Amino acid sequence: MKTEKKVLDELSLHASAKMGARDVESSMNADSTPVLASVAVSMELLPTASVLYSDVAGCFKYSAKHHC
């Protein structure tokens, strides 16, 4: 869980830089994992973020449309 939290925090920082902190907070209040995954893909963040996330989730396929 610590690794997943670390990745989510990293995605939040990237998303915050793109969207602004208020939008990220709104995303975190919802079901944060798929929301941030969608943000990571839709905002075209660094591919490494998706790779890191795949290691944690085990089912993330670089596209938020592929859910377990």
Curated annotation (Swiss-Prot):
Q: Could you list this entry's UniProt keywords, alphabetically sorted.
A: Antibiotic, Antimicrobial, Bacteriocin, D-amino acid, Lantibiotic, Plasmid, Pyruvate, Thioether bond
Modification sites for Pyruvic acid (Ser): S32
Source organism, top-level taxon: Bacteria
PTM summary from the entry reads: It is not established whether the 2,3-didehydrobutyrine is the E- or Z-isomer.
One BP annotation, GO:
defense response to bacterium
As stated in the Swiss-Prot or TrEMBL entry, residues carrying the post-translational modification D-alanine (Ser) are: S38, S42, S50
The residues joined by the cross-link Lanthionine (Ser-Cys) are S54-C59, S63-C68
* Propeptide residues per the UniProt entry: 1-31
MF term (GO), any: signaling receptor binding
Entry-annotated residues carrying 2,3-didehydrobutyrine: T33
Q: Which residues form a coiled coil?
A: none
Job description of the protein: Inhibits the growth of selected species of the genera Lactobacillus, Pedicoccus, and Leuconostoc.
Q: What is this protein called?
A: Bacteriocin lactocin-S
